[in-house]
């Protein structure tokens, strides 16, 4: 006998909090947290997933009353997992994101007392801003739902790892990206090779990744397939066929075949360069960056320029020595190099450090030193050596700083600390750890909207020595 779900009816969504979760209340005033697709001022019925002492967690069963904020989208605009806020007007998105950054400090108001809250910086592009998009092929067969769809190509359905929604146009990619997507859709349908089934590990088509430079227009495609489905001679024939097809799409300047034979639904495997140049070039300001299939690069080029502009403007020390921590491929360090005496870029991922070194040489930057090491361990070594920075810039992953890092960082006694955050929750956790006894004070906070139509929000925080 199936599980009998508890439901709650007529829950008003008051607002969206971190991670795009809807906040409402039941008839007793108890908090109700609603995942996936909640829109402020709508009224919904929910299925209760967890009933805790201080909150109820659930998902939407049905919308009883649409939000007055909700835009009526044309069929050209489809809502996928990567753009759940698309029905919400962009001005309202900015307002909600700015409020979320303020609210993460609600339990530590003394940390931001006297700080200047700057208006949120909007992305220069609201649509078509992504320089990288990943599409998936899938088949979805369900006897329970009466579905026998052996070909789907698009994005994962919101909250569903095993379902793909057929895509006709992605508003986060530009027209060239969408043209390439539609061409590959037709190509895959016509050649009749089956889509990959993750449950049986059988099938051929898996993913299509499109990387397109906003500044140069150079475009890379990565075609991810299960090459074990074909025999060796068939694989070679397919590669010839694929090269011929790609040659007709003039916007493609680089192409790779990804031999993806693992069971996990991720873009991994052996990359084989099959056409065009091995890399594409993107620009940030007047700097050039080579992007390979595995390279990390901010997915909103123009938004990244805004983020780094804000970061640079936060630094008030003239000609500083800068520690660039969690440097990734070194974009922040390279942008800051022209106004710094010396930059030390620290990153744990070897491939990212290699990209950094290559791009430094490409741009003839001489005052940046790249160190491939864990941040907390290297800081300990530098402390023993007596190395002293004027400014420390921190750009950690979503998990935030390593627990040992804030205390060590404080021991260097820099004039300024700039924290570039992609996760408001860990930002609010780490800032008090850096200055538990008031050694530093927060002077400036600027939210930056790098990802319109999503719940993601960046923020740059400046701290100065007291």
Model-derived segments and their meaning:
Residues 2-9, 15-18, 229-466:
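Rossmann-like S-adenosyl-L-methionine
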Residues 1-78, 377:
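Terminal RNA-binding accessory module
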Residues 210, 217-226, 288-292:
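Short, aliphatic-rich beta-strand segments
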Residues 22-27, 154-157, 222-224:
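Short, acidic/hydrophobic/Gly-rich beta-strand patch recurrent on exposed beta strands
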Residues 41, 173, 300:
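Short, conserved phosphate/pyrophosphate- and ester-handling motifs at nucleotide-, phospho-/glycolipid
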Residues 61-72, 79-194, 215:
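Extended interfacial segments that mediate partner engagement and assembly in macromolecular machines
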């Amino acid at each position: 006998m199936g599980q009998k779900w508890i439901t709650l009816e007529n829950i008003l969504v008051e607002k969206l909090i971190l991670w795009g979760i809807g906040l409402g209340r039941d008839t007793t005033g108890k908090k109700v947290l609603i995942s996936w697709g909640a829109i402020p001022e709508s009224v919904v019925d929910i299925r209760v997933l967890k009933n805790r002492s201080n909150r109820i967690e659930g998902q939407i069963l049905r919308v009883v009353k649409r939000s007055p904020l909700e835009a009526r989208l044309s069929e050209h605009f489809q809502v996928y997992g990567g753009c759940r806020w698309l029905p919400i007007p962009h001005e309202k998105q900015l307002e909600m994101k700015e409020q979320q950054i303020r609210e993460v400090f609600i339990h530590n108001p003394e940390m931001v007392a006297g700080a200047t809250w700057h208006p949120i910086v909007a992305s220069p592009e609201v649509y078509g801003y992504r320089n990288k998009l990943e599409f998936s092929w899938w088949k979805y067969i369900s006897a329970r739902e009466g579905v026998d769809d052996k070909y789907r190509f698009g994005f994962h359905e919101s909250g569903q790892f095993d379902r793909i929604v057929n895509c006709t146009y992605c508003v986060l990619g530009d027209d060239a990206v969408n043209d390439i997507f539609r061409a590959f859709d037709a190509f895959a349908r016509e050649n009749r090779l089956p889509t990959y089934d993750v449950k049986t590990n059988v099938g051929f088509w898996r993913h299509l990744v499109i990387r397109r430079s906003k500044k140069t227009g150079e475009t890379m495609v990565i075609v991810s397939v299960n090459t074990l489905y074909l025999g060796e001679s068939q694989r070679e024939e397919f590669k010839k066929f694929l090269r011929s097809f790609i040659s007709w799409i003039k916007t493609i300047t680089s192409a790779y075949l990804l031999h993806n034979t693992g069971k996990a639904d991720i873009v991994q495997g052996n990359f084989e360069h099959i056409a065009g140049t091995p890399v594409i070039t993107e620009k940030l300001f007047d700097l050039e960056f080579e992007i390979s299939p595995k390279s990390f690069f901010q997915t909103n080029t123009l938004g990244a320029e805004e983020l780094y502009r804000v970061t640079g403007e936060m630094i008030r020390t003239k000609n500083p020595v800068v520690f660039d921590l969690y440097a990734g491929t070194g974009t922040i360090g390279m942008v800051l190099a022209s106004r710094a005496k010396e930059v030390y870029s620290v990153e744990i991922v070897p491939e990212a450090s290699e990209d950094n070194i290559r791009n430094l040489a490409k741009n003839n930057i001489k005052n940046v030193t790249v160190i491939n090491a864990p941040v907390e361990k290297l800081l300990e070594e530098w402390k023993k050596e007596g190395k002293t920075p004027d400014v420390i810039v921190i750009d950690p992953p979503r998990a935030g700083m390593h627990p040992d890092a804030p205390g060590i960082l404080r021991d260097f006694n820099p004039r300024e600390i700039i924290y570039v955050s992609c996760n408001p929750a860990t930002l609010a956790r780490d800032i008090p750890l850096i200055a538990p006894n008031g050694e530093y004070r927060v002077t400036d906070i600027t939210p930056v909207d790098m990802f319109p139509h999503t719940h993601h929000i960046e923020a740059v925080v400046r701290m100065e020595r007291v």
